[in-house]
Amino acid sequence: MMARPWNFSAGPSALPEAVLQQAAAEMLDWHGSGMSVMEMSHRGKHFVQICDEAEADLRELLGLPADYAVMFMQGGGLGENAIVPMNLMGRRSTPAADFVVTGHWSTRSHKEAGRYGDAQIAASAAEATEIDGQAQSSWTWLPPVDTWRVRKDSAYLHLCSNETIGGVEFTEWPDPASLGAPDVPLVVDVSSHFLSRPLDIARAGLVFAGAQKNAGPAGVTVVIARRDLLGHALPICPSAFDYANVAADHSRYNTPPTFAIYVMGLVFKWIKAHGGVRGMEEANRAKAELLYGYLDGSAFYRNPVQASVRSRMNVPFVLRDESLNDAFLQGAEAAGLMQLKGHKSVGGMRASIYNAMPLAGVQALIDYLKEFERRHG
């Protein structure tokens, strides 16, 4: 068996090796049941135990109060861009929602919501600007909260708190009351930094995350919603996507992605065993500081994001000489550094350094960056 490479994929991303080993060991026989998790009925006692334990562990990791429902759904973050408005826009007589647009994913959220109601932009980073005397191109900065314009009668205010492609991150979420909209719940797409640092879930009405970045394999989406927001689905909302139904049946209203939920539950236990969300935050801060520190000190590479809003999870960077891009990627793969190519919409490179990426992987990347610069700089 070949050595495992360092996987910098933005998602689906690397899983903790200990989780993969446990899943492999239990593949044919889960806890003496004689069955693989993939063969279990989603309503049978074994899977009910797996699902309920995963929810309990997640609640413990996040300190969730009882008035928040936890749902394990399907469709990914992109699916939630439709499921959220179908569930929440019915809270108002005229379906409407506001959006803080800061990159690719919040742009798609805004566009999708427009199919179900009046989706307006409350703030945007779509234009170039200047911050502290530094020119910033579009999607590399975040609009100051005091510039947001939120309607008091909106069904919700949406933001993406970590833009996977652009590499910008909200470290704090505003209280809608401070924006003059106390009755407008905050909806946050936390997909690419879920469980990477403490998040003030209680400040939001609803958060969602595709698991395939920090929480597990592709196929399951975590939705956490304040219970008073359930039960307002638009008539066009499919029953399987109605949060009230999913919450009432403990994520088993229809057949859920059983194996993905099982592996996600193993990831929750791995996080608990490694210091919980605080432990993840400490490790992620160290990795990000190491990588950004090297990039900032190099004249060969450049990170385009405003320093104060850089993501700890997704680090885009460009080579000053873009004609070397192909050689860079080929050399990286030869060195066991995989999935470093940037998203097609922005080009360049991107290193996603999620929870499962150890400090040693980031150091291996930096060693390669140094060597490539030495040979081509």
From Swiss-Prot:
The modification N6-(pyridoxal phosphate)lysine is found at residue 213. It is found in: Cytoplasm. SUPFAM superfamilies: PLP-dependent transferases (SSF53383). Transmembrane segments: none annotated. Its main location: cytoplasm. L-glutamate binds at residue 43. Binds 1 pyridoxal phosphate per subunit. Its EC number is 2.6.1.52. It catalyses: O-phospho-L-serine + 2-oxoglutarate = 3-phosphooxypyruvate + L-glutamate; 4-(phosphooxy)-L-threonine + 2-oxoglutarate = (R)-3-hydroxy-2-oxo-4-phosphooxybutanoate + L-glutamate. Keywords: Amino-acid biosynthesis, Aminotransferase, Cytoplasm, Pyridoxal phosphate, Pyridoxine biosynthesis, Serine biosynthesis, Transferase. One of its GO terms (biological process) is pyridoxine biosynthetic process. One of its GO terms (cellular component) is cytoplasm. One of its GO terms (molecular function) is pyridoxal phosphate binding. It comes from the Bacteria. Pathway: Amino-acid biosynthesis; L-serine biosynthesis; L-serine from 3-phospho-D-glycerate: step 2/3; Cofactor biosynthesis; pyridoxine 5'-phosphate biosynthesis; pyridoxine 5'-phosphate from D-erythrose 4-phosphate: step 3/5. HAMAP family: SerC_aminotrans_5. Catalyzes the reversible conversion of 3-phosphohydroxypyruvate to phosphoserine and of 3-hydroxy-2-oxo-4-phosphonooxybutanoate to phosphohydroxythreonine. Belongs to the class-V pyridoxal-phosphate-dependent aminotransferase family. SerC subfamily. PANTHER family: PHOSPHOSERINE AMINOTRANSFERASE. This is Phosphoserine aminotransferase. It comes from Bordetella pertussis (strain Tohama I / ATCC BAA-589 / NCTC 13251). The gene is serC.
